[in-house]
Amino acid sequence: MKIAIGCDHIVTNEKMAVSDFLKSKGYEVIDCGTYDHTRTHYPIFGKRVGEAVANGRADLGVCICGTGVGINNAVNKVSGIRSALVRDMTTALYAKEELNANVIGFGGKITGELLMCDIIDAFIKADYRETDDNKKLLAKIAHLETQHVNQEDPDFFNEFLDKWDRGDYQD
């Protein structure tokens, strides 16, 4: 099984710990970045994880940022992605078994590495339990998806990154 994983600069260490854990379990890890602690933007890496899952390069995805909120919102904008921001086992299993979540998101500064690893392991092993009700709910969610014209362009964020480099945006 292939697992795509991505993060922002705030939780690179946590992502690497999770990546090492997944590899130790025999999973192939597709590291979508970021790879260091240089200030960056979580939407880039959420998009990369989402695209890896949506296009079939990865079976499932893991997204991590400081609180998990930003990167989880970003990954959910990719068509075909159903990501759940979780902090506990019950929510993660519900997301997979009832809503067929294909990405799981975490706040790396909220949830500890060991708990993240336990939750991810259970999430991967859980199976979607298809029912008529679940199918109807997923169809309604899929109906909400919209595709932006240039969204699949790998340079989609360049305009915003150029503005950042010029100092147009501030933290």
UniProtKB/Swiss-Prot annotation:
The reply to whether Transmembrane figures as a keyword in the UniProt entry is: no
Alphabetically sorted, this entry's keywords are:
Isomerase, Lactose metabolism
Q: Does the keyword Protein biosynthesis apply?
A: no
Task: Provide the catalytic activity annotation.
Answer: aldehydo-D-galactose 6-phosphate = keto-D-tagatose 6-phosphate
| Pathway in which this enzyme or protein is active | Carbohydrate metabolism; D-galactose 6-phosphate degradation; D-tagatose 6-phosphate from D-galactose 6-phosphate: step 1/1
Q: What class of enzyme is it?
A: isomerase
Gene Ontology MF, one: ribose-5-phosphate isomerase activity
Q: What EC number(s) does the entry state? A: 5.3.1.26
| Lineage top rank: taxon | Bacteria
Tell me which Gene Ontology terms the entry assigns under biological process: D-allose catabolic process; galactose catabolic process; lactose catabolic process via tagatose-6-phosphate; pentose-phosphate shunt, non-oxidative branch
Q: What does the subunit section of this Swiss-Prot or TrEMBL entry state?
A: Heteromultimeric protein consisting of LacA and LacB.
Q: Which PANTHER family match?
A: DNA DAMAGE-REPAIR_TOLERATION PROTEIN DRT102 (PTHR30345:SF0), RIBOSE-5-PHOSPHATE ISOMERASE B (PTHR30345)
Query: What family is this protein classified in?
Result: Belongs to the LacAB/RpiB family.
Name this polypeptide is given: Galactose-6-phosphate isomerase subunit LacB
Could you tell me which species this protein originates from? Streptococcus equi subsp. zooepidemicus (strain MGCS10565)
Q: Which gene encodes it?
A: lacB
